[in-house]
């Protein structure tokens, strides 16, 4: 009885076939990058003020002073949600009284924007906010729109694995790409905010399902050494490339419906990939479809110019026949030790996710050009992923994760000390904070997989990554705090990031340790506060095995 990797070892690790699969599966992630963050431009809120109807009998002086001023970032700007009572100032205008000279504006009664709003078109021509007036009393709908997209992501993460196990990796990959692209196209024809949001939930379900299945397909087709780079650099970097394309599209297409139409084009361009990306041979074997699996391996061998054995898979022989004890979610809380570690992991994943998505969603709200800021927010992710990969190869996990979290949280806290006029420095600090948090986020899959025993490893990664989806759902409300105080989101995110950095130091170290197979082995892992070494841990230090991939 042989292992699958042993059977196909003759193919090699990095031939033309593997390079093609690596590139095509990574490229299929690009639409996820801009769909996942498209809401920052689709639901952008431009400057706005109460509309004063042309029919109002006002002098030019009163029309120019019909909206009260408020202080924002040290300067006076027109109020966004109120105006002076129109009937009152119309009477003053008819009497020939001048605002500020004959009438004290501070004593005038105010009213809400009964005639709607005037929206600035300096940044956006139209967004869903301007389409359905999602401001003032309805401004709560903007973060809810984003949160519901991530609710769809959460739902999709639950079903994507089960669907791909049932119907095959390739079928589900392209079906979910079609869902993501098709429902994005349908959003163009939304006639209400409710319709747009419901469709957005479905787009979120397709977005994460496509991402997860592409990840699974790559790890199953590619060899062990290539899986490391694919799971850390390939998928993440191409996601960042898609994220960088978003502000480029949005800069030239400033109408939200046309932007959505443009964002569906790359999804359509992925259709030809169907004829180049094969089904997972591992999945075919699990379905006892040996002939189809052999055909794929033979084509791969031909592409790599390698001779094929007469028999690759023996239909009588079972691959990977080991039977594992079934695990339940309660196993993650079976003992005090594993329960504490699980709770700590849930907090670490959730709050790191809050920091990552809140900073990403807040990028257009920074001073300066919204499109450039969003592009920089995406660009900084590429060196963050590369740095994380390099650090994971040699350095202790808990220390490097804690270090980048301290870095990210510390610079976010420092922003409040920067004068308002030094906005370039503030933007630079935000990007450095994004760098640290993104690096930490990309390390969590590896760290979590190394901590838990084989029995519950996949479940642990699944449950903790679900906590990150919860973090993404609440992240828009951290951005929303900026409506009350410009610095509040950074103070809250910075404080929480530093706290979870401290929490990370209390995890056991996994670098150089043999992966635990049972819960009993996990219980003997050395904790930060303990200076004692168990005999097992000392043995593993003499014969270390390093895992630098999530699977």
Swiss-Prot record:
Superkingdom to which the source organism belongs: Eukaryota
InterPro entries: MFS_dom, MFS_sugar_transport-like, MFS_trans_sf, Orgcat_transp/SVOP, S22A4/5, Sugar_transporter_CS
Induction entry: Overexpressed upon TNF treatment.
Annotated binding of ATP, by residue: 218-225
Matching SUPFAM superfamilies: MFS general substrate transporter
Keywords on record: ATP-binding, Cell membrane, Disease variant, Glycoprotein, Ion transport, Membrane, Mitochondrion, Nucleotide-binding, Sodium, Sodium transport, Symport, Transmembrane, Transmembrane helix, Transport
Residues linked to a glycan: 57, 64, 91
Gene Ontology CC entries for this record: apical plasma membrane; basal plasma membrane; mitochondrial membrane; mitochondrion; plasma membrane
Regulation: Allosterically activated by intracellular ATP.
A Pfam family of this chain: Sugar_tr
pH-related activity note: Optimum pH is 6.5-7.0 for ergothioneine uptake and transport efficiency decreased at more alkaline pHs.
GO biological process: amino acid import across plasma membrane; carnitine metabolic process; carnitine transport; quaternary ammonium group transport; sodium ion transport; triglyceride metabolic process; xenobiotic transport
Reactions performed catalytically: ergothioneine(out) + Na(+)(out) = ergothioneine(in) + Na(+)(in); acetylcholine(in) = acetylcholine(out); (R)-carnitine(out) + Na(+)(out) = (R)-carnitine(in) + Na(+)(in); glycine betaine(out) + Na(+)(out) = glycine betaine(in) + Na(+)(in)
Its job: Transporter that mediates the transport of endogenous and microbial zwitterions and organic cations. Functions as a Na(+)-dependent and pH-dependent high affinity microbial symporter of potent food-derived antioxidant ergothioeine. Transports one sodium ion with one ergothioeine molecule. Involved in the absorption of ergothioneine from the luminal/apical side of the small intestine and renal tubular cells, and into non-parenchymal liver cells, thereby contributing to maintain steady-state ergothioneine level in the body.
Family: Belongs to the major facilitator (TC 2.A.1) superfamily. Organic cation transporter (TC 2.A.1.19) family.
Subunit text: Interacts with PDZK1.
NCBIfam families: 2A0119
Disorder this protein is connected to according to its UniProt record: Rheumatoid arthritis: An inflammatory disease with autoimmune features and a complex genetic component. It primarily affects the joints and is characterized by inflammatory changes in the synovial membranes and articular structures, widespread fibrinoid degeneration of the collagen fibers in mesenchymal tissues, and by atrophy and rarefaction of bony structures.
Matches recorded under PANTHER family: SOLUTE CARRIER FAMILY 22 MEMBER
Further comment found in the protein's record: Mediates the Na(+)-independent and pH-dependent bidirectional transport of exogenous prototype organic cation tetraethylammonium (TEA).
Annotated protein name in UniProt: Solute carrier family 22 member 4
Organism (species): Homo sapiens (Human)
């Amino acid at each position: 009885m042989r292992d699958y990797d042993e059977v196909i070892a003759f193919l090699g690790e990095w031939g033309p076939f593997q390079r093609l699969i690596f590139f095509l599966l990574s490229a299929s992630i690009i639409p996820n990058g801009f769909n996942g963050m498209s809401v920052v431009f689709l639901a952008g809120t431009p400057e706005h003020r109460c509309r004063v109807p042309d029919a109002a009998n006002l002098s030019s002086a009163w029309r120019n002073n019909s909206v009260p001023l408020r202080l924002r970032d040290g300067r006076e700007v027109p109020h966004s949600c109120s105006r002076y009572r129109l009937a009152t100032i119309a009477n003053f205008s008819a009497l020939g009284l001048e605002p500020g000279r004959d009438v004290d504006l501070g004593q005038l009664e105010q009213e809400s924007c009964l005639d709607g709003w005037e929206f600035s078109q300096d940044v956006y021509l139209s967004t869903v906010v301007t389409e359905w007036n999602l401001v003032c009393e309805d401004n709560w709908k903007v973060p809810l729109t984003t949160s519901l997209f991530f609710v769809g992501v959460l739902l999709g993460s639950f079903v994507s694995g089960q669907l791909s196990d049932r119907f095959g990796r390739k079928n589900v990959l392209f079906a979910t790409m079609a869902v993501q692209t098709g429902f994005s196209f349908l959003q163009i024809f939304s006639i209400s905010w409710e319709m747009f949001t419901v469709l957005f939930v479905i787009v979120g379900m397709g977005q994460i399902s496509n991402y997860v299945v592409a990840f699974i397909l790559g790890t199953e087709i590619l060899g062990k050494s290539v899986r490391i780079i694919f799971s850390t650099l390939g998928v993440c970097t191409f996601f960042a490339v898609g994220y960088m394309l978003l502000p480029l599209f949005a800069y030239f297409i400033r109408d939200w419906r046309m932007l959505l139409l443009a964002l569906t084009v790359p999804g359509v361009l992925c259709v030809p990939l169907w004829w180049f990306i094969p089904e997972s041979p591992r999945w075919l074997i699990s379905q006892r479809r040996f002939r189809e699996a052999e055909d794929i391996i033979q084509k791969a061998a031909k592409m790599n110019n390698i001779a094929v054995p007469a028999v690759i898979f023996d239909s009588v022989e079972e691959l990977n026949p080991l039977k594992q004890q079934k695990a339940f979610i309660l196993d993650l809380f079976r003992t005090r030790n594993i329960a504490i570690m699980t709770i700590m992991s849930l907090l670490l994943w959730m709050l790191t996710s809050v920091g990552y998505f809140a900073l990403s969603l807040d990028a257009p709200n920074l001073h300066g050009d919204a499109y450039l800021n969003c592009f920089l927010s995406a660009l900084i992710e590429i060196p963050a992923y590369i740095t994380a990969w390099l650090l994971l190869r040699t350095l202790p996990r808990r220390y490097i994760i804690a270090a980048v979290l301290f870095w990210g949280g510390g610079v976010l806290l420092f922003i409040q000390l920067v004068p308002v006029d030094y906005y370039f420095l503030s933007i630079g600090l935000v990007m450095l904070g994004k760098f640290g948090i993104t690096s930490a986020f990309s390390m969590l899959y590896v760290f979590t997989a190394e901590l838990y025993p084989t029995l519950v490893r996949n479940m642990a990664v699944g449950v903790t990554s679900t906590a990150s989806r919860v973090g993404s759902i609440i992240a828009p409300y951290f951005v929303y705090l900026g409506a009350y105080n410009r610095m509040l989101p950074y103070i809250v995110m910075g404080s929480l990031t530093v706290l979870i950095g401290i929490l990370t130091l209390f995890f056991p170290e996994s670098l150089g340790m043999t992966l635990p197979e049972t819960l009993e082995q996990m219980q003997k892992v050395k904790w930060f506060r303990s200076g004692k070494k168990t005999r097992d841990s000392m043995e593993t230090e003499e014969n270390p095995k390093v895992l630098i991939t999530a699977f």
